[in-house]
From Swiss-Prot:
Keyword Nuclease among record annotations: yes
Highest taxon of the lineage: Viruses
Identification of the protein by name: DNA endonuclease I-HmuI
Source lineage: Viruses, Duplodnaviria, Heunggongvirae, Uroviricota, Caudoviricetes
Coiled-coil regions listed: none
SUPFAM superfamilies named in the record: DNA-binding domain of intron-encoded endonucleases, His-Me finger endonucleases
The protein's Enzyme Commission number: 3.1.-.-
GO MF term list: endonuclease activity
Entry keyword set: Endonuclease, Hydrolase, Intron homing, Nuclease
Organism for this UniProt entry: Bacillus phage SP01 (Bacteriophage SP01)
GO biological process: intron homing
Pfam families cross-referenced by the UniProt entry: HNH_3, I-HmuI_NUMOD-like, NUMOD4
Keyword Nuclease: yes
Amino acid sequence: MEWKDIKGYEGHYQVSNTGEVYSIKSGKTLKHQIPKDGYHRIGLFKGGKGKTFQVHRLVAIHFCEGYEEGLVVDHKDGNKDNNLSTNLRWVTQKINVENQMSRGTLNVSKAQQIAKIKNQKPIIVISPDGIEKEYPSTKCACEELGLTRGKVTDVLKGHRIHHKGYTFRYKLNG
């Protein structure tokens, strides 16, 4: 097994080529969170601030050649639990989806239903000036404000604090 310091967290955390994440401070291997999408996640902390990372991306960033901006990580065998560096590769989103469809690991109709529901969910956008405005969907807000939908979604999920100075939250029912 090979270990490397996690970029941006040098001296705090390390990742192995097998998908383990180690805390130097505690001297322990950290337990992964596995949400409904099946991708292993890990929370890392530095300077009192926490950030969540997908384990397969950490492994690929540190052990797999070929990274370019915009590429995603593909599990060659389709098994999201297999985060060995030899099972991961950098591909385009299109190739990743094609691979998942050919393996039968992507439920297209379910993915479309989820995307449709999420895209129709009203959000509140807070401008850098603190002004709040409601939008019927993430898509509408992004189109009007010239924002990147993926980054806005990351803020809504708590993976980012803001995007281009804007913060976002889902509108509560009622």
